[in-house]
Amino acid sequence: AELSGMAESAPAASKAQAEAKEQDGVLLTLDIPSYLPVMTYCDNQALREEMYRAYSTRASDQGPNAGKWDNSPVRAEILALRHELAQLLGFENYADKSLATKMAENPQQVLDFLTDLAKRARPQGEQELAQLRAFAKAEFGVDELQPWDIAYYSEKQKQHLYSISDEQLRPYFPENKAVNGLFEVVKRIYGITAKGRTDIDVWHPDVRFFELYDEKNELRGSFYLDLYARENKRGGAWMDDCVGQMRKADGSLQKPVAYLTCNFNRPVSGKPALFTHDAVITLFHEFGHGLPHMLTRIQTAGVAGTSGVPGDAGELTS
């Protein structure tokens, strides 16, 4: 009853998490694969509120664990050290230092861009929120939407308008089909073939290693693929460089290696992981970041691959 409204896969994953810690019942965490299904599908408003408050106040001086893992002093120290670093390098502040290698010319230009974007986007956001409030009132008798209600009633509205749910799409995106589909797209567009290797050391059994070969069977680059959420792993999804392409002093060419990291739901009870449509988009997006790094022809480390792309242009490639 506590988890009514949720698809079978979410409670099964939560039960598996509890069993892994030798606990009874189910274990809900603030990792996105655990948190998001509760906020989107769980009929229990009190549980949604509890999860929302815990998530939005994590590592702070607020909320149910106020001060226990408070990162505020760490943030203050980071800001102070960044300011000191910027001044040592001759910049007025860290924002000026950061923009020295980016397309934007100065902090005011960035603020003007963001202010203009907010001005243009806000009317649409307000319109959609008004429509959601009207829907929740008409269909469910909800007088006032709380922050922990937004995702839940947005999903109800989507099902009402379009008769479709993310949960209905997941069986079409098992992990192997999604990953192999990504590799097939890359092969068709770039003539690049991904080949797995099992003789490379990895930091967790979930992690896999692949090499990319072009049509001449030349090794162009490699990457570690770390797809699943797990305890003590940083949240989110990202690509990062392990090593960049570089012509070394002895004349040999160091080939690029990337990290492609996500936090998707893991396989449960021997069944393959089923990805949401958003997860598939994320997978393609992060691989899109990896391609410029791994396929570069530049042999000077400081400008090879993503090192040669301004930071505020990085999202354009993926």
Would you name each region that the model predicts?
Residues 56, 228, 265-268, 288, ...:
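Hydrophobic alpha-helix feature that most strongly marks membrane-spanning transmembrane helices
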Residues 22-26, 32, 42, 60-65, ...:
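Substrate/cofactor-recognition hotspot
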